């Protein structure tokens, strides 16, 4: 019988029968900026489908990730990874904090994608952290930071092209990485998920927002937008 190991805002981790494997289940929960939790019926099923599809695509271009296989509508089998305590945020368009903190016009397109690191902590409200701090805290080595940056940009470039192909703009995405040990050596591995829960996705022509950005003001449209994204990706 599988044992619950951890429950986050939108996913639950369970033990698996084999060592170094886990079961990741996608729930319908979503957390608003106010901290209130809401349920979007069917969201977890769509996120499982979308993330499984995208992780498979990334594996095909040589990006090591924790996804092994989809078990059922809500669950997938994943590799255990020692997850880094940071998130990597890549943005190609002014949105979110760039509008609030820098006064940029929403939708302004950057010459090159901008990369930020944030502490992976809801308790501390995901503060920005720089490379010098990451090194001094002992969270990653310099080589690991370099590898994470290279992989993150490669992932963002690939996903941007994939989404453009289905009429969607990848405005921003949040990526998480970790290390997997093979004897004394370790490899960097992409973890978590890639879905409308952690990507800002806009219609490429109208800039109409899709995914999690609808939660605050148009929650009734959330499922429909996730479904649209899943259906568009089926075309690839």
From Swiss-Prot:
Gene3D superfamilies: ATP-grasp fold, B domain, Phosphorylase Kinase, domain 1. GO terms for molecular function: ATP binding; phosphoribosylaminoimidazolesuccinocarboxamide synthase activity. Pathway: Purine metabolism; IMP biosynthesis via de novo pathway; 5-amino-1-(5-phospho-D-ribosyl)imidazole-4-carboxamide from 5-amino-1-(5-phospho-D-ribosyl)imidazole-4-carboxylate: step 1/2. It comes from the Bacteria. The keyword ATP-binding applies. It holds the Pfam family SAICAR_synt. It catalyses: 5-amino-1-(5-phospho-D-ribosyl)imidazole-4-carboxylate + L-aspartate + ATP = (2S)-2-[5-amino-1-(5-phospho-beta-D-ribosyl)imidazole-4-carboxamido]succinate + ADP + phosphate + 2 H(+). It is an enzyme of class 6 (ligase). Its EC number is 6.3.2.6. Keywords: ATP-binding, Ligase, Nucleotide-binding, Purine biosynthesis. Belongs to the SAICAR synthetase family. HAMAP family: SAICAR_synth. This is Phosphoribosylaminoimidazole-succinocarboxamide synthase. It comes from Rickettsia canadensis (strain McKiel). The lineage of its organism: Bacteria, Pseudomonadati, Pseudomonadota, Alphaproteobacteria, Rickettsiales.
């Amino acid at each position: 019988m599988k044992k619950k190991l951890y429950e986050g805002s939108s996913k639950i981790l369970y033990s698996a029968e084999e060592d170094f494997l886990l079961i990741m289940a996608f729930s319908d929960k979503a957390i608003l900026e106010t901290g209130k939790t809401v349920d979007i019926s069917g969201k977890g099923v769509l996120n499982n489908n979308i993330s499984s599809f995208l992780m498979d695509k990334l594996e095909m271009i040589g990006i090591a990730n924790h996804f092994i296989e989809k078990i059922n509508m809500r669950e997938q089998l994943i590799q255990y990874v020692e997850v880094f305590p940071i998130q990597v945020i890549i943005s190609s368009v002014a949105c979110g904090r760039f509008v609030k903190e820098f006064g940029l016009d929403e939708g302004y397109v950057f010459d090159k994608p901008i990369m930020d690191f944030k502490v992976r902590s809801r308790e501390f409200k995901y503060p920005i952290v720089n490379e010098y701090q990451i090194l001094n805290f002992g969270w990653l080595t310099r080589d690991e930071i370099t590898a994470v940056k290279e992989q993150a940009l490669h992932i963002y470039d690939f996903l941007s092209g994939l989404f453009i192909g289905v009429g969607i703009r990848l405005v921003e995405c949040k990526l998480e990485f970790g290390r997997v040990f093979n004897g004394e050596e370790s490899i960097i591995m992409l973890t978590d998920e890639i879905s409308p829960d952690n990507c800002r996705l806009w219609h490429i022509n109208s800039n109409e927002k899709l995914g999690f950005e609808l939660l605050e003001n148009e929650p009734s449209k959330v499922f429909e937008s996730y479904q649209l994204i899943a259906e568009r990706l089926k075309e690839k």
